[in-house]
From Swiss-Prot:
GO molecular function: 4-alpha-hydroxytetrahydrobiopterin dehydratase activity
Catalytic activity entry: (4aS,6R)-4a-hydroxy-L-erythro-5,6,7,8-tetrahydrobiopterin = (6R)-L-erythro-6,7-dihydrobiopterin + H2O
GO biological process, one term: tetrahydrobiopterin biosynthetic process
HAMAP family, A to Z: Pterin_4_alpha
Pfam families on file: Pterin_4a
InterPro entries per the UniProt record, alphabetical: PCD_sf, Pterin-4-alpha-carb_dehyd, Pterin_deHydtase
Keywords for this protein: Lyase
Source organism: Shewanella sp. (strain W3-18-1)
EC number: 4.2.1.96
Keyword Chloroplast: no
Name of the protein described by the UniProt record: Putative pterin-4-alpha-carbinolamine dehydratase
Family classification: Belongs to the pterin-4-alpha-carbinolamine dehydratase family.
Length: 112
């Protein structure tokens, strides 16, 4: 079984395929703490991380920023006291690509 967090993102162009319904069902099982949201017709992955204070939430946000730069794939991040909401989707295809699931798994690893 492939471990998503061990995979690397690939360049995603505007003509890249979105995940199929079958792929979505398989991939979402690999990141059980994430939910699929649809905003403005665009499918996205979202998770809320809880922290004891703002400083810890900000430290996590900074780690996530470094990861996003390394993989050249960038999430929506909303940081507030004790909480960080992370949203992954592929802007170029206006939906979900395998990269988003890889990055969700890598984001989860930042907690460890």
């Amino acid at each position: 079984m492939t471990v998503l967090s061990d995979m690397k993102c690939e360049a995603c162009q505007a003509d890249a395929p979105k995940v199929t319904d079958e792929e979505l069902a398989e991939l979402v099982r690999m990141i059980p703490d994430w939910s699929v949201q649809v905003r403005d017709g665009i499918m996205q992955l979202e998770r809320v991380y809880k922290f004891k204070n703002f400083k810890l939430a900000m430290a996590f946000t900074n780690k996530l920023a470094e990861l996003a730069e390394e993989e050249f794939h960038h999430p929506g991040i909303f940081t507030e006291w004790g909480k960080v909401t992370v949203t992954w989707w592929s802007h170029s295809i206006k939906g979900l690509h395998r990269n988003d699931f890889i990055m969700a798994a890598k984001t989860d690893q930042l907690l460890g």
